[in-house]
């Protein structure tokens, strides 16, 4: 049989997509998002930061199985202090993201910051506009950051209406990333966290069903090094520094 010819010992373990540092691995779009979270924790550890991660959102196609992949990868997430907290709705998840950016300001904190990933389908972006806009006005932590992951069903294959989330993100003053390949879900996600930390903004990222539900063999890239111009913390700094929203002017 084919399995006898190859030999079980020659087959890589299923979780190599999360543990392998280099080489070629197979993963789906939702698994790439899990890998991205683990790589962010690895980036922070390499930089000497003791960060935590937080994932929260509400399931819906094309991100309907993202929570399943997070539960399956639970031991890997736990090993990197990444918590998964499914929300009652997308609004609550966005509010959780705002609170997580205050972590290092708490006297009892044990982390240097918390990076947060929100997820939801297009209508979730629509209904959460108030929470997203207010969270973005509060800002992000320099050692945390917020990435808002929207799953868009352009063809209305499994939704009541078609949706395109860029407009909702732009309306809330979020920059938007639009990865086109499985490996870009990882690289764009890491860039999004770096951008959020530097700019003080929450960062939107979208994916269509044809990508997030697909799978591919990809070559794992080395962890990136992002060049950041010096940031001077002033009274007008855009990062989260106080318990009240920054002046939108």
Say what each PLM segment does:
Residues 1-182, 208-211, 224-225:
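Thiamine diphosphate
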Residues 138-141, 198, 244:
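Alpha-helix C-cap/termination motif
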Residues 171-176, 202-204, 235-236:
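A short, terminal or domain-edge coil/loop segment
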Residues 172-175, 189, 216-220:
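Extended, well-folded catalytic/binding cores that form a central cleft or groove in large enzyme
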Residues 182-216:
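Internal alpha/beta core interface subdomains
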Residues 206-239:
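Terminal amphipathic helices with adjacent charged low-complexity linkers/tails
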Residues 240-249:
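Single conserved hydrophobic/aromatic residue that forms the stacking wall/gate
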């Amino acid at each position: 049989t084919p399995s006898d010819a190859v030999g079980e010992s020659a087959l890589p373990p299923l979780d190599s997509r999360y543990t392998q540092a280099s080489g070629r691995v197979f993963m789906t779009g939702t698994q790439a998002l899990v890998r991205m979270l683990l790589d962010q924790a690895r980036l922070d550890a390499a930089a000497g930061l003791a960060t935590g991660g937080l994932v929260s959102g509400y399931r819906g196609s094309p991100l309907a199985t993202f929570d399943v992949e997070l539960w399956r990868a639970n031991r890997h997430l736990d090993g990197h202090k990444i918590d998964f907290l499914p929300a009652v709705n997308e609004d609550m998840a966005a509010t959780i993201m705002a609170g997580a950016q205050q972590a290092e300001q708490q006297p009892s904190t044990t982390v240097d910051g918390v990076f947060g990933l929100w997820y939801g389908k297009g209508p979730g972006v629509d209904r959460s506009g108030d929470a997203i806009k207010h969270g973005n006005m509060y800002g992000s932590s320099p050692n945390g950051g917020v990435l808002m992951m929207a799953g868009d069903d352009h063809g209305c294959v499994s939704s009541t209406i078609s949706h395109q989330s860029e407009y909702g993100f732009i309306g809330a003053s979020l920059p938007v990333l639009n990865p086109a390949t499985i490996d870009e879900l990882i690289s764009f996600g890491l860039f999004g966290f770096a951008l959020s930390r530097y700019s003080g903004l929450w960062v939107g990222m979208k994916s269509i069903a044809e990508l997030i539900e697909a799978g591919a063999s990809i070559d794992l890239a080395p962890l990136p090094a992002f060049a950041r111009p010096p940031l001077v913390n002033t009274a007008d700094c855009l990062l989260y520094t106080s318990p009240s929203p920054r002046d939108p002017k």
